[in-house]
Amino acid sequence: MIERKHEGPRSGTGARFADTVAIDFCDGERDLYGIAWITRLPNAGRVRASAVVFAGGELAEMTEHEDDGAVDDWGAAQASGVRMTTAVPLERWSLAVTGSSVSLELDAYALLPPLQLEHPELSHMTGIEQYEHVCRVDGTLGIAGSSTPLRGTGRRVHCWGEFGWDRVDRWRTLYAASDGGRAISVAAARPAGSDGHDSELRWARLFGTDTGEPAFDQVRLSTVFDAGGLPAKAGLELLNEGDEFPLRLGGEAVCGARSERDGHEIAISFFRWSLEGEPAYGCYEMIARR
C-alpha cells in the first residue's frame, strides 16, 4: 500500500540504484505535450534531469544533463533547469522547466488514488518498484517569448531500484486518461534473449479500482512503429476471467522523439486514444537495449 512516506527519497545498495520522479502533461485542445524527469543516483553522487516538450506536433525542447550532486528531498528537488516540488504528498505537486527554447510551469492535482505496479514476476525481472497518479494539470508554457495557458491531463510516476538490464531487452510503459475520469496504466518487459513479442511480461490495471481487485488477466498490446522506430499506432485488449468481451483501446501518436543513453534507445510518444469510444490522452515510453 502506498503511503505518504513513499513520497520521500528512496534508498538502495546497488551502484546503479536510481530514484526517479517523472511528470508529464497532455493538452489535446492546444496540442501541447511534454514530460520531465529528475533522477537521483545517490550511490554514485550524481543527479540527472531531462525534459521533452512538443507544441503543434513539433519538438520544441529536448534536454538532458547529468552532473555531480544530490537531491535529498522530493519535497523540493532541482537539477539542471528542472524543478519539482511536493505541495501535498500523494495529492498535489508542481513542475517547472527552464530550457533553451521553452519555459514551463504547471501544477498537477491527483484525480484518483495512487496505482502501484504489483506484478511479482515483472518486478523481479526489472528490479524496480513504482507507483503513479493520473492528474489534472494546469499551468503555462512559454515558447520563443510567447506564453500559452496549459490545461489537461497528465501523470506523475515515482519509481526506484536498480534496473535489471541483464534480464531485460525492452521496457515499455503507457497510459491513457480521459476527461471523464477513466484511466488505464500498462507496463511490459521483454526478457533478455527472448525470441519475440509472445515472451513479453505485461501488466495493466484501471486507476481508481479497489486495492483488492487484481490487474487484468490478459493484456494484449500491439504497436505499429514508424520508419524512425517511434510508436505510431497501438491497440490494447484487456480481459479478465469471466468477461465476455475485452476492454478495448486504440491510439495514434500525435508527436514523438527518440534519444540514446548508455547503450539504450529511448522513445517517447504522446498518444490520442479512444477508450471504448471516449477520447483519452497519454504517454507511451519505451527503452530498449541497442
Question: What positions do the PLM features span?
Answer:
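Structured soluble/peripheral alpha/beta segments that form catalytic or ligand/cofactor-binding pockets
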Residues: 1-290
